[in-house]
Amino acid sequence: MKINYLITAAILIGITTSAMAQENQNEYRSIFNKKADQKVDHGGYGAFGVGYTTIDSKDAILLSFKGAWVINHSIALGIAGSGFFNNLSKTPNSDEHYLGGGYGGFYFEPIIFSKSPVHLAFPILIGGGGITTIPHNYWEWDTNIHGYDYDVFFVFEPGVELEFNMVKFFRVAVGASYRFTNGILLNYDVDKEVPIDALDGFNVYLNFKFGKF
């Protein structure tokens, strides 16, 4: 008899435990009414940076900005943009040209182990931009000189960043990315075309981020 009582008690305890677990599993949840350990943390940051790339096989400088909303310390969503110009070695009385312009768009950034002092991020930019050719002597006092040509383009730029948490509100990121475009149609002058893939290429950069991460 005692064995039967023990078996019955064990079955009842098992049923009760299972029911309680099922009740917790099936508990109604909503986006705006969460337990403390389920709440999503929100933050944001602004950033500026400087970088190096090549455009039409010539050295070029990049100046960039970013503004992003940070979700749960692990994903950043926002906007980003960069300005650029190449052919930095100016030769007096030269008929060479700059390529100058900029691009920007939607910015998506997964962040891995954000709270670690050193961690990784994988930024992706999708957007568009514009580019123009500018003669080296454009800035001289000659009102007859103008930029010869311009074009617009689509851009997709994935990258990787090594981030350093300097203090709670400030991070430094060393990054590399690759800029893909749909090509550009430009002429330096009537007899010389800009390569269609002149904008495609690797970038390296240094970013300074300020905000709540």
What do the PLM-derived regions correspond to, one by one?
Residues 47-51, 92, 141-146, 188-191:
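Extracytoplasmic loops and strand-loop junctions of Gram-negative outer membrane beta-barrel proteins
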Residues 74-156, 164-168, 207-212:
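Gram-negative (and chloroplast) outer-membrane scaffold detector with strong preference
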Residues 1-30:
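Bacterial Sec-dependent N-terminal signal peptides
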Residues 66, 121-127, 173-177:
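Outer-envelope exported proteins of Gram-negative bacteria
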Residues 38-46, 73-75, 116-122, 168-172, ...:
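Outer-envelope beta-barrel architecture signal
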Residues 165-213:
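Predominantly the C-terminal beta-signal and adjacent terminal strand-loop region
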Residues 44-46, 61-65, 102-106, 152-160, ...:
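Hydrophobic, lipid-facing positions within transmembrane beta-strands of outer-membrane proteins
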Residues 21-72, 209-213:
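Short glycine/proline- and aromatic-enriched beta-strand/turn motifs that initiate or cap beta-hairpins
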